[in-house]
Design a protein with these regions (language model features):
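Alpha-helix capping/helix-boundary segments
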Residues: 9-10, 40, 108-109
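Extended, non-globular alpha-helical segments
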Residues: 38-65, 124, 131-136
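A secondary-structure boundary/capping signal
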Residues: 6-7, 36-37, 105-106, 124
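Hydrophobic/aromatic ligand-binding patch that stacks against planar heteroaromatic rings
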Residues: 26, 64, 93, 114
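PIN/NYN-family metal-dependent endoribonuclease catalytic core
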Residues: 5, 21-49
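Metal-dependent nucleic-acid phosphoesterase active-site entry motif
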Residues: 1-18
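Active-site neighborhoods of divalent-metal-dependent phosphate/nucleic-acid chemistry enzymes
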Residues: 69-102, 107, 111
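Acidic, PIN/NYN-like endoribonuclease modules and their adjacent C-terminal/linker elements
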Residues: 81, 88, 107-136
């Protein structure tokens, strides 16, 4: 299964005390492939620095970059499906990588449910947790 993770869900999944820790553990166990672009990696690093610190950001990025479950995607066309330009990189990555799901808690992404082409399937963390549970 191929996913794109919005920064907000990645941020909450890395803490050892987080209820969402299962997401990063599932990634590390190879239960899904994480599709990223250089823009997404840059945003991940920036937000981890803001919310945690530089060392934590470096460790997170290293973990993602060195994982055999990470797929790097080149974006050749920008669809601009979302009103927030910063969010479009995630939708474009999902389309270009043919992702099964874009995982986000950001309600701005719900507009994608109304767009039939290109189709981007979005799920919240709890919805995706159910998807993983049903695969066991």
């Amino acid at each position: 299964m191929n996913l794109v993770l919005d920064t907000n869900v990645l941020l909450v999944s890395f803490s050892m005390r987080s209820r969402s820790r299962w997401l990063i553990e599932s990634f590390l166990a190879g239960r899904f492939t994480l599709s990223v672009t250089s823009e997404i990696i840059h945003e991940y690093e920036e937000k981890f620095c803001e919310h945690w610190n530089q060392l934590a950001a470096e460790n997170v990025i290293r973990t993602i970059l060195e994982s055999p479950h990470t797929q790097f995607v080149n974006i050749y066309f920008k669809f601009n499906l979302l009103p927030d330009e910063d969010d479009n990189k995630f939708a474009d990555c999902a389309i270009s990588s043919n992702a099964d799901y874009l995982i986000t808690e950001d309600r701005d992404f719900t507009i994608l449910k109304t767009i039939s082409f290109p189709k981007v399937h979005i799920r919240t963390l709890s919805e995706f947790e159910q998807v993983l549970e049903n695969q066991r």
